[in-house]
């Protein structure tokens, strides 16, 4: 059976692995979107690192966890947010102001809502982590 939302499955797997204390998690299948989200997780300090492994099929990511994720998940449906509207989505998905990160896909790529606000651009909220 095909996976309808690979990003949601990947984030659910990360969340479950963190909650039971695993230090590594494999995400299959790999995609550019998942890679970009993992890059934001790495930049914000939620994971120690990750690498893409080409297995001749869709590939996979091997993620090194460090126990910094309390909860993460995909946002469905993908809400559009202007540069000045991120606070509304912070209140909905994050537990406190300036605690956690919204992952936003913009015309300039995937980034955290902090970077998007800094650059003055909006986009679609696709995930959250705290």
From Swiss-Prot:
InterPro entries referenced in this protein's UniProt entry, alphabetically: Ribosomal_uS8, Ribosomal_uS8_CS, Ribosomal_uS8_sf
**PROSITE patterns reported for this sequence:** RIBOSOMAL_S8 (PS00053)
GO terms (BP aspect): translation
List the molecular function annotations (GO) for this entry. rRNA binding; structural constituent of ribosome
Keywords assigned by UniProt? Ribonucleoprotein, Ribosomal protein, RNA-binding, rRNA-binding
Organism domain of life? Archaea
Q: Name one Pfam family in it.
A: Ribosomal_S8
Q: Which GO terms describe its cellular component?
A: ribonucleoprotein complex; ribosome
Q: Which family does it belong to?
A: Belongs to the universal ribosomal protein uS8 family.
Subunit composition and interactions: Part of the 30S ribosomal subunit.
Q: Which NCBIfam families match?
A: PRK04034.1 (NF003115)
Summarizing the function annotation, the protein's role is: One of the primary rRNA binding proteins, it binds directly to 16S rRNA central domain where it helps coordinate assembly of the platform of the 30S subunit.
Database matches in PANTHER family = 40S RIBOSOMAL PROTEIN S15A
Query: What name appears for this protein in its UniProt entry?
Result: Small ribosomal subunit protein uS8
- The organism named in the record is Natronomonas pharaonis (strain ATCC 35678 / DSM 2160 / CIP 103997 / JCM 8858 / NBRC 14720 / NCIMB 2260 / Gabara) (Halobacterium pharaonis)
Q: Which gene encodes it?
A: rps8
